[in-house]
Each structure stands twice: as C-alpha cells, then as structure tokens.
Amino acid sequence: PAKCAASIEACQPLAKKVIAWFQPHGYGPTKFLRNDFVEEISKALRPEDEIWMSEIFYAGGTAVKDISANDLINDLKEKGVQAFFVENRTDLVAALRPHFTEDCVLLLMGARDPGLEQFAKTVWEQL
C-alpha cells in the first residue's frame, strides 16, 4: 500500500490529475492489506485524482476467494475518493476515455502477473 501511494504522489507534480490503476495480487494478501491500502490511497489522492482497479490477479491454488477488488473500491468511495472498478482490465481504456483530461497522468500498477507488461503495451497502443 505505501509503495502504491508513493507512486501516485510521485506522479502528482507532473500533472493536475493522476489516474491510477491497480490490480491487486492474491486474495489472501488483498484481504490482509485491505485497510492499509484504503487508508494509504485515500491519503495520497488529491480531490481531482482517481483510483481504478480490476479484479484480483489469481495465480492458482486453493485460495479462498472471499474478497474482490470492488470491495476496496467501495471502501475508498466511502472515504470520498473518486474510485472505479473495471472487472476485466481489457475494458479499462474504454472506461477511462471520458476521464482523461489535457493535463493528466495514467499510472498502471500491479505485481506478480506475468501479463502486466503486455497489458501496459496494449494500453499504450489503445491510447
């Protein structure tokens, strides 16, 4: 959570608006870090900034799928944050388009998903 917040804060001097996307990794870690994530992100975002999430990356195994990235989005909304959920990340650019401004930064964050690099390239191509 602190690294995500620091990444957002590092982008803020570059533009009037930061649109940050994060794909949580693992159901257990997401559940464990839920409150910390919500607290860190809500403190880092300015009123004009946005946080977007897609569903948790599942690497397989016997994980109990008892949390969703949308749960974190709802927690953030309760704190007054502009927070949005796009279940499938392939739908992200289409959903983001109306939110782009002349002076904004798009920050993509995630971990452990081997497809993230290709996803970032695809986002770049779609912009």
What are these regions (language model features)?
Residues 1-127:
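ATP-dependent carboxylate-amine ligase
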